[in-house]
Amino acid sequence: VQRVEEPSGLPVRSQSWELTGLRRALGPARDHARQFLEAGSDDLAEDLLQDALVVVAELVSNAIRHAPGPCVLTLSQDGGRLLVSVRDGSASSPAPRPPDLSAGGGGFGWHLVQRLSERVEVYTHGESGKTVTATLVLVGGVKRCEV
């Protein structure tokens, strides 16, 4: 685990994992996230842990589905906030689409990420890709993004 100091002087825990661009990367991504969160907090509520794991799975799944090649998952915990970042090789911004309730075609992920997160940001890196970062509140009353 890498530790860096923020200007506030508070330590930030951060760790990154390179994942294949294959669906089998979803399980390891969730496992990494669970281990990271459990190592950083003895009293993280189960519902908040599950919310974080859903956000990790959805962001990694979107990267695998819509971007070529591997992606990088980075988790950073700063006090009561968790930043879930996924960098992929597509410069296209995520585009919400209507959920497909009949054919099982998805469409729920981006809506879930926005609903479970306090904030979601997309940073583009020219033609080399983008990073999607979701910020989750891990303590107290959870303020969620407006959908």
Segments predicted by a language model, with ranges:
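Conserved beta-strand-loop-beta-strand hairpin that lines the nucleotide-binding pocket
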Residues: 1-20, 64-147
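Conserved short strand/loop->alpha-helix "switch" segment adjacent to the catalytic nucleotide/phosphoryl-transfer site
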Residues: 31-57
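Short, well-structured hydrophobic secondary-structure segments
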Residues: 55, 60, 64-65
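Solvent-exposed, flexible loop/coil residues
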Residues: 5, 23, 52, 58, ...
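Short beta-to-alpha transition helix within the HATPase_c
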Residues: 11-31, 35
